[in-house]
C-alpha cells in the first residue's frame, strides 16, 4: 500500500499526495471535462452550464424540507427560496472576482474580474432557468411517475 501513495509530482513540499484515485487517467479525464476546466468555453457559457445544473437540483431541498413542506405553497416557496439562494451565490461570486482578480489582460479569461463577473451572470441566468424548469416539472407532476420517492 505504501508504494501507491507518493508525493505529487515527486515533490514532497507541494502539500498533496498522489494516490491511485486522484492521479488516475479516469479521474483526470472527468475533471478536465467539467465546465469550469473545459477549454474553449467563455466564462458566460461556463456559468450558464454550471448554473443550470445547480438551479435544477437546488429547488428540491427547499421544496421537500422547507418550513412550508406540508402546505400547498411548498413548491412555490421552494422556488422562491432557491432563487434567493441563487441570487446570494451570484453576488458572492461577483464579490470574489472583484477582490481576488484585477482587470489586467490574461490568457485565461476566468483569471480576471470581468471574467468572474461574466461567470456569475451566466450562473444567475442558468440557475434561475434550471430552478424554473424543475418547478415546471414538479408542478405538472411529470416526475412522479418516474421517481416514486417524490410522491410522499
From Swiss-Prot:
Pfam families named in the record: PsaL (PF02605)
Keyword Transcription regulation included in the entry's annotation: no
Stromal membrane side: 1-72, 145-152
Keyword Transmembrane assigned: yes
Superkingdom assignment: Eukaryota
GO biological process terms held by the UniProt record: photosynthesis
Membrane topology summary: Multi-pass membrane protein
Membrane topology (Lumenal): 94-123
An example Gene Ontology CC term for this record: photosystem I reaction center
Keywords: Chloroplast, Membrane, Photosynthesis, Photosystem I, Plastid, Thylakoid, Transmembrane, Transmembrane helix
Transmembrane segments: 73-93, 124-144
Localization terms from the record: Plastid, Chloroplast thylakoid membrane
HAMAP family linked: PSI_PsaL (MF_00447)
Family statement drawn from the similarity comment of this UniProt entry: Belongs to the PsaL family.
Protein name according to UniProt: Photosystem I reaction center subunit XI
Organism: Cyanidium caldarium (Red alga)
Source lineage: Eukaryota, Rhodophyta, Bangiophyceae, Cyanidiales, Cyanidiaceae
